[in-house]
Amino acid sequence: MNPEIPTILALTMQRLAGGITEHGAAFAQGQMGLIGMMMTLSAKEYERGAEIRVAENSDIRALFAALAPEVKDAALKAKLEAAAAGKDESLLISKLNANNYALRRLLTEAQVYAEDNGARAAEQRIWAVLKAMAARRLVQLGP
């Protein structure tokens, strides 16, 4: 989820400490609605945040393992193989995010390579992983 929960909580504290009642009841009511929505999103993220990141990282690594044998660029192939062999050492969100960001940067590199080299099957596999990632991160406000 972006922004991350610490950012949402800090913003909430700023809103509450900033004297929202000074601007009138309508403004305060709007701010409280916004804060309530942010807290609901934070609760949902808290519940599923680690699971989403672990699944994404696993899917990306599996994709790299599948793509690497077809890559002719030696440097990219080595990066894909190294990333595919990696694993998440911690379930801390900050550590999972760091791994996820690094994997996503390499995924972008792999996608550019696939597009530049007409590797349509690789492109389709990449898009399937991206679609699954987007579906996992979808946030619904209802129950």
Model-derived regions: residue spans:
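N-terminal interaction modules that seed assembly of large macromolecular complexes
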Residues: 6-62
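Short, surface-exposed, charged/polar-biased interaction segments
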Residues: 29, 33, 37, 56-63, ...
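Intrinsic-disorder-associated interaction segments
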Residues: 9, 53-56, 69, 85, ...
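Aromatic-anchored, charged helix-turn/loop surface patch used as a conserved interaction hotspot
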Residues: 42-89
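Histone-fold modules and their flanking histone-like tails across chromatin and transcription assemblies
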Residues: 1-3
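Surface-exposed polar/charged interaction patches
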Residues: 15, 19, 45, 66-70, ...
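Amphipathic alpha-helical binding modules
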Residues: 93-143
